[in-house]
Regions:
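The canonical Cys-X-X-Cys-His
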Residues: 71-86, 137-141, 787
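Beta-propeller domains with acidic blade repeats across secreted/periplasmic ectodomains
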Residues: 437-797, 801-811, 820
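Gly/Gly-Pro-rich "capping" loops immediately C-terminal to redox-active cysteine motifs
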Residues: 72, 84-114
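Beta-strand-rich N-terminal accessory domains
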Residues: 157-364, 381, 395
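Detector for the c-type heme attachment site
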Residues: 82-88, 104, 117, 127, ...
Length: 909
């Protein structure tokens, strides 16, 4: 048996694994020292400090075949996502290419092991891999890529080398299977995009080649793009621990199918096992299924023809017209899920179940319908499926290859449908002894708590020097439900001691203790099973959550604070099976309208109009409007005081570098792979960003927010940018010249967070900044989730908060007064510029790098603004200004501003 059982659960290393930075940036020479590893030796597990590296390497000879299989499995299931292979680019084309690139920190196995273990540059430390697994990866890379394809990077291992290796007393812990996504208790339903398949299904079709990747032929695949998977057998552990399930597709109001087996799904997805370009499939026996088509006939004409938007690949996406059918939400009562929707003007409640007949599962659909003006028709399953009906108000019939239920008009309907696999005998006889259809209304008033245990976590107060203190408020990772706590949004109630936090794993938590300063927080799980929540907002004390499939409003119906009704406030989302199209952030304008951003498809052209857009949802949830287009991976939304927006975007195809966009309605922001782009693919055909963010400064910007706190002194009213990629916070100084906003970023003087930072809110009670963070894709920071508070303390900041590009140079305005004499020393400044090339290729190198001479530096009358005279200044894609000055107290201050110049303003006075 192989020593290694593949651990696809290394979720935070997936997007950056082995990214050795083969093409060094201007700062790489500074990083190439042991001291610049992300983890220091003191932070490593004890076994790493006494590890028998010689023994681990020599053991590879005895287990060569096993080691190669293990390393290959890891690479193909994890590393390939980003790194690809010689025939296929990975999703991060700038990631290290083992078959052609050069290692920075040494090509011998021990040096590579150190980079894997301790992290370096944009690669996080691989803390969930054991030493055996790490050497298996290294062994595979050496044999598969380095030895023949990149021999200059292949290191010959000999006795002299082995003799010089550390020979400790242990080989680390034994590898073990680790699947936290499959072990978590999600509750009895989980919304996601699923493909329903039976045993013996063909391999997934996946395009290869240059970007944009070709569309696969998926017209016959049974995808539930907004699938609500409901567990129908009894037992603890939630949907993932079940043995039988039914799937409801709330785009089409259809039951997509039912299945039984071990394992629920194969967990192949970016936010499950981390795999890219894939959606999870069901596993086990598929007992019946329905095609991707309306579940109910059009109430106006009785036909099932699908009227929805048809994409380029002939598939149809989005919800049915509201006049046809509309998903209203779902209720929970104990472990029972009650779906609520309308067909025409008819209100429908539906619940699933499972019974047994002759040792075979019988799936049930219990439906309660309000009176109808005319008959309605619902497809149950293909006509070879065994079907029986209990109750009054409806009949069964065959129609065009399907078993169909047709209701009788003018009276309420209360029925239970029994469904068995094709070939099931005697189901009609069994129906005579099956329980009658239940009234579901009594289950829609709130039930007993499903998650009664409240959890607590400690607050670790910061003791850093400087103007900011960072308090760690980590979640209770020892949860009885094995939650991963990948925190993706937060907001506060009128009582500032109380807030709500969502996670990408589908949870919403009510958290208390923010302002009481008791040293701990209390966590109550109030919602679960949602589809990748990535934004949350409290509006008039009501909770709204941005999910990939809908904007959800949470209702507590009985006062226990848990969600009893998940209202589908807006379901206009156009969801496809692509892994990359997250729905990000949630903000509300002064009129009460909601805003979120929807990402485009990675390395592929858009299929639906919503791909790569900023989206507005009306205050009542009844209307959706696309505000701006052309985004690639827009991580959140910021609403500006003037009614415009800020949306970040990530380096990639048509994005030569990360960008912070000041967004205006109706404009296009550069991604030619988004839906219906302009014909002009040059820079003239798009809006320019506020700043092109250099990857060394921030690998992946997330959401911006305005400082709304007098306690933050001179930063009050200024703009902050959060970094998912590097776990940082930046201030964003900017100026506006004509219609163009331009500026830069400056990193706040605080330590990096242990997660990427996703969302931030200022607490109205204590006036401090709270941050929610996670690590799930493309972040260097390894911790799964984190909650933080940044407190401004009574120390001077001396931070640049203003910037201006003029015909004679640059102006930097600081929060505090500076020393005039120190400012005038021109050797204290360096200014570098570079260009980028925007194309369909992933990202861009620096081009036309220059160092500009500063010929004069002076302080203005306010004592806070430095005027730099730079004779050769010109508009530029990228600029980096470093400075070393003194404040008015004589304390040395140094820093770096990275910015973009589109236009030069008036001459410095």
């Amino acid at each position: 048996m192989e020593m290694y059982r593949i651990r696809l659960g290394v979720y935070f290393l997936l997007a950056a694994l082995l990214n050795f930075s083969c093409k060094p940036s201007s700062t790489d020479s500074e990083l190439a020292t042991p001291g610049s590893f992300i983890l220091q030796e003191s932070e490593l597990p004890d076994y790493e400090k006494d590890l028998d590296h010689k023994g681990l390497l020599t053991a590879l000879d005895d287990r060569y075949d096993e080691s190669i299989r293990t390393g290959e499995h890891i690479y193909n299931n994890v590393c390939f996502n980003c790194h690809g292979n010689p025939d296929q680019l990975g999703s991060i084309p700038t990631a290290f290419k083992f078959w052609e690139d050069t290692f920075n920190l040494g090509k011998d196995p021990y040096s590579i092991y150190q980079v894997l273990t301790r992290g370096y540059g944009s690669m996080p430390p691989q803390v969930h891999l054991t030493p055996v697994e790490k050497y298996d990866i290294i062994n595979y890379l050496r044999e598969a890529y380095l030895k023949e394809k990149n021999p200059g990077q292949f290191f010959e291992i000999d006795s002299t080398y082995l003799a010089g290796l550390p020979s400790g007393s242990n080989k680390g812990p034994a590898p073990k299977e680790f699947k936290p996504w499959a072990e978590m208790d999600y509750g009895n339903f989980l919304i996601n995009t699923y493909e329903l398949v039976g045993k013996g299904a063909p391999e997934r079709e996946q395009s290869k080649g240059p970007s944009p990747l070709a569309d696969e032929n998926l017209i016959d695949a049974n995808f539930a793009y907004k699938g609500i998977a409901v567990r129908v057998d009894q037992g603890v552990g939630g949907v993932a621990a079940g043995k039988a399930w039914m799937m409801f597709d709330h785009d089409l109001m259809r039951v997509a199918g039912a299945w039984t087996g071990e394992g629920f799904i194969d967990w192949e997805a970016i936010l499950f096992n981390g795999k890219h370009n894939i959606s999870p499939r069901t596993v086990g026996n598929l007992h019946f299924e329905n095609p991707v088509a309306p579940g109910w006939a059009n109430p106006a004409n009785g036909k099932f023809e699908d009227p929805r938007f048809q994409a380029r690949d002939k598939r149809k996406f989005g919800p049915l017209p509201r006049t046809w059918a509309q998903y209203q939400g779902l209720y929970q009562f104990k472990d029972q899920v009650i779906l609520s929707y309308t067909v025409g003007s008819t209100k429908v409640l539906e619940s699933f179940g499972m019974e047994s007949w002759q040792n075979q599962p019988v799936f049930t659909r219990t439906l309660n319908l309000s009176p109808t003006a005319k008959p309605l028709k619902m497809r149950i399953a293909q006509d070879k499926t065994a079907v029986a009906l209990i109750g009054k108000g409806a009949i069964l019939k065959k129609e065009n290859g399907f078993m169909v239920m047709e209701t009788m008009p003018s009276a309420p309907v209360q029925v239970k449908i029994l469904i068995g696999s094709a070939g099931t005998k005697g189901l009609t006889d069994y129906a005579k002894s099956s329980a009658p259809p239940a009234s579901l209304a009594v289950l829609t008033i709130g039930g007993p708590s499903r998650f009664p245990k409240k959890l607590s976590s400690q607050v670790t107060m910061g003791t850093q020097e400087g103007p900011f203190q960072v308090d760690l408020m980590n979640p209770p990772f020892d949860s009885p439900w094995k939650n991963q706590f990948r925190l993706s949004g937060l907001d506060f109630f009128k009582d500032p001691n109380k807030g709500v936090i969502c996670s990408t794993d589908g949870d919403v938590w009510l958290v208390e203790g923010f302002t009481q300063n008791t040293g701990k927080l209390t966590w109550q799980r109030i919602a679960s099973g949602l589809f990748q929540p990535l934004g949350i907002k409290v509006v008039n004390e009501q909770i709204f959550v941005t999910c990939r499939d809908q904007l959800v409003k949470l209702h507590d119906l009985n006062g226990d604070r848990e969600t009893d009704f998940y209202e589908a406030f807006n379901t206009d989302h156009q969801v496809t099976d692509h892994f990359h199209e997250f729905a990000m952030g949630l903000q509300v304008d002064k009129e009460g309208n909601f805003y979120y951003a929807k990402s485009a498809r990675h390395a592929r052209e858009a299929l639906v109009p919503q791909h790569g857009t900023l989206i507005k949802v009306s205050k009542d949830g009844q209307k959706t409007e696309i505000i701006a287009t052309g985004f690639r991976a827009a991580n959140g939304v910021c609403i500006n005081p003037d009614g415009t927006f800020i949306v970040t975007d990530q380096e990639g195809h048509w994005n030569p570098m990360n960008r912070i966009n000041w967004v205006k309605k109706g404009e296009f922001y550069g991604n030619m792979f988004s839906f219906n782009p302009p014909k002009d693919s040059t820079e003239a055909g798009m809006e320019q960003p506020l700043v092109w963010v250099e990857r060394d400064r921030d690998q992946s910007p997330s959401e911006l927010l305005w400082v709304e706190s007098k306690k933050w002194g001179a930063l009050n009213g200024k703009l902050l940018n959060l970094s998912y990629g590097y776990g940082k916070v930046f201030v964003v100084p900017f100026e506006k010249i004509g219609d163009q906003v331009q500026g830069g970023i400056f990193e706040l003087p605080i330590p990096r967070f242990s997660t990427g930072v996703m969302r931030g809110r200022f607490n109205p009670g204590d006036g401090q900044l709270y941050l929610a963070g996670l690590s799930a894709w493309g972040s260097t920071q390894p911790q799964l989730g984190g909650l933080y508070r940044i407190r401004k303390v009574d120390q001077p900041m001396v931070i640049p908060v203003g910037i201006a590009a003029t015909t004679t140079g640059m102006k930097l305005t600081f929060t505090d007064k500076l020393d005039s004499k120190a400012v005038q020393k021109i050797s204290s400044y360096s200014v570098k510029t570079w260009d980028l090339i925007r194309s369909r290729k992933y990202g861009s190198k620096h081009h036309n790098e220059q160092t500009l001479q500063v010929t004069k530096a002076e302080l203005d009358a306010s004592g806070k603004t430095i005027n730099l005279t730079i004779p050769s200044i010109q508009p530029t894609w990228g600029m980096e200004i470093t400075y070393k000055v003194k404040d008015s107290r004589g304390i040395e201050r140094e820093g770096l501003v990275q910015n973009t110049i589109h236009q030069l303003g008036s001459k410095t006075p």
